[in-house]
């Protein structure tokens, strides 16, 4: 199997209810778990992590499963290195980050 098919990345998408204080706390805890576990926030509820191998991707899949809140919708998508490289990001127009948002430089990844 070619190398680019063995190296993996993981995307986590979630939609969690935040109606009650307990649900908000669970959503915040899940968000903080993902950041502490090395995931990079790509969008409001989309997080990505480069894993390097299928085995490590499976490890992070188990870790996310163990951290799931009691209520909500969470998807995990495993992508090959070649699929991750094909991802594109555009920010257009007069987009500005909120005033209270702090800039966090992206993590440096070693891809090869």
Swiss-Prot record:
Q: In the Enzyme Commission scheme, what number(s) does this protein have?
A: 3.1.-.-
Quote one Gene Ontology molecular function term: metal ion binding
Q: Which domain of life is it from?
A: Bacteria
State the InterPro entries in the record. Answer: CRISPR_associated_Cas2, Virulence_VapD/CRISPR_Cas2
Which residues are recorded as binding Mg(2+)? 15
The cofactors named for this UniProt entry are: Mg(2+)
Going by the UniProt record, its keywords in alphabetical order are: Antiviral defense, Endonuclease, Hydrolase, Magnesium, Metal-binding, Nuclease
> Which regions form coiled coils?
none
Output the GO biological process annotations, alphabetical, semicolon-separated: defense response to virus; maintenance of CRISPR repeat elements
What binding partners and quaternary form does the record give? Homodimer, forms a heterotetramer with a Cas1 homodimer.
Q: What is this protein called?
A: CRISPR-associated endoribonuclease Cas2 2
In the UniProt record, what gene is named as encoding this protein? cas2-2
């Amino acid at each position: 199997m070619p190398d680019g098919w063995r190296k993996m990345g993981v995307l986590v998408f979630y939609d969690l209810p935040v109606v009650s204080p307990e649900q908000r706390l669970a959503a915040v805890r899940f968000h903080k778990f993902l950041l502490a576990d090395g995931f990079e926030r790509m969008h409001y509820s989309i997080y990505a992590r480069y894993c390097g191998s299928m085995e490590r991707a499976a490890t992070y899949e188990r870790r996310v499963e163990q951290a799931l809140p009691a209520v909500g919708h969470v998807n995990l998508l495993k992508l090959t290195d070649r699929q991750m490289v094909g991802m594109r990001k555009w920010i257009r127009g007069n987009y500005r980050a909120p005033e209270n948002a702090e800039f966090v430089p992206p993590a440096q990844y070693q891809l090869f």
